[in-house]
């Protein structure tokens, strides 16, 4: 699909290839627009065979987000082949580990974004409305190990210190840290402890997912975990983990880029909407680094990360046109 568009550079990692397409039709001093894509998927073809039913295409990555990659390439090709020379260089970066947190590609993404004027993320649009994702929550993952003292539950009920009982108190405490009206959630998703019903448990463990819309909330949650204290004497708490992704906040730079997208949509008579997403993308990284970032520019569909993942085929040309229309209007952005 990229044939004839520009030079493709490949970097091999343990989790697959990182691909960089540089579309630079004419020499220029203008900084590029960076489009972020990923080609790893949640499901494989054995689990989710590729097939079409009327205007729906089903298969791994048809929504998240190989469709966004294909859409981007066709938008570039359409501009070049219809005589609309690109008003700026465009770099398209594709990584292979986004679904697992982009650990192998994070540094490369940040390096490229610092050379760019703006970042467009071709992740899928919001499932129902097709909204662009103007903000995204950041996330963190924590593990809490609780050490108590074992004893026979019948013969020596006062001799033990229950790690499971302590865990129950800590779950309530951690969930109370949530501030849902302000976008902060705390979820103890895994809780395990003890070995037998007749033994007072000496160990318990919790895995906790946290989400936040602002850096301020991220700091508050982080400090709460760092200061976590036992309820019962004799209990030891060990907390590991921390923040994984920064939030993609509502910044003036991001709003300026969104304004250009609104103009691009208006030219197509396309009713553009925006939303806030609870999941993370590589756009979280670039936005937190201070680079104007806009997300959700990929395809419309539904079933994100589900076995019914699907692409709305009939809306695909319009989403491609939106990407092309936006690229055409970014010549003076950030200059």
Predicted regions and their residues:
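Single conserved hydrophobic/aromatic residue that forms the stacking wall/gate
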Residues: 1-9
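Metal-dependent amide/peptide-bond hydrolase catalytic core
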Residues: 12, 124-129, 134, 140-335
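Short acidic/glycine-enriched loop/turn segments that link adjacent beta-strands
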Residues: 14-17
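Active-site beta-strand termini and strand-to-loop segments that position acidic
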Residues: 21-26
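Active-site metal-coordination/substrate-binding segment of hydrolases
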Residues: 29-94, 100, 312-318
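Short beta-strand segments
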Residues: 36-37, 93-95, 120-123, 145-147, ...
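Acidic-glycine-rich active-site phosphate/pyrophosphate-binding loop
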Residues: 40-53, 120, 135-145, 263
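Acidic/histidine-rich catalytic neighborhood of metal-dependent amide-processing enzymes
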Residues: 65-66, 70-135, 179, 331, ...
């Amino acid at each position: 699909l990229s044939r004839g568009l520009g030079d493709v550079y490949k970097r091999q990692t343990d989790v697959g290839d990182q691909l960089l397409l540089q579309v630079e039709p004419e020499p220029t001093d203008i900084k590029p627009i960076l489009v972020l894509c990923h080609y790893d998927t949640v499901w494989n073809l054995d689990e989710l065979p590729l097939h079409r039913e009327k205007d729906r295409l089903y298969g791994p990555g048809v929504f998240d987000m190989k469709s966004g990659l294909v859409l981007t390439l066709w938008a570039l090709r359409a501009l070049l082949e219809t005589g609309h020379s690109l008003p700026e260089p465009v770099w398209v970066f594709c990584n292979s580990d986004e679904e697992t947190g982009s650990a192998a590609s994070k540094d490369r993404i940040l390096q490229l974004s610092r050379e760019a004027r703006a970042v467009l993320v071709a992740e899928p649009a919001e499932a129902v409305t097709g909204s662009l994702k103007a903000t995204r929550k950041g996330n963190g993952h924590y593990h809490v190990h609780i050490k108590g003292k074992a004893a026979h539950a019948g013969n020596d009920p006062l001799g033990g210190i229950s790690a499971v009982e302590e865990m129950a108190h800590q779950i309530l405490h951690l969930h109370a840290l949530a501030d849902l009206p302000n976008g902060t959630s705390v979820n103890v998703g895994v809780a395990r402890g003890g070995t037998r019903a007749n033994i007072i448990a000496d160990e318990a463990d919790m895995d906790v997912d946290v989400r936040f819309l602002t850096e301020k909330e991220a700091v508050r949650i982080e400090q709460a975990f760092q200061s976590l204290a036992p309820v019962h004497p004799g209990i030891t708490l060990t907390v590991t983990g921390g923040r994984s992704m920064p939030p993609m906040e509502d910044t003036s730079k991001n709003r300026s880029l969104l304004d250009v997208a609104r103009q691009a949509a208006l030219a197509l008579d396309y009713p553009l909407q925006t939303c806030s997403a609870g999941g993370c993308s590589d756009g979280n990284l670039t936005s937190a680094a201070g680079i104007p970032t806009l997300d959700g520019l990929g395809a419309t569909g539904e079933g994100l990360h589900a076995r019914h993942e699907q692409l709305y085929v009939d809306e695909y040309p319009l989403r491609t046109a939106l990407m092309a229309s936006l690229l055409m209007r970014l010549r003076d952005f950030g200059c």
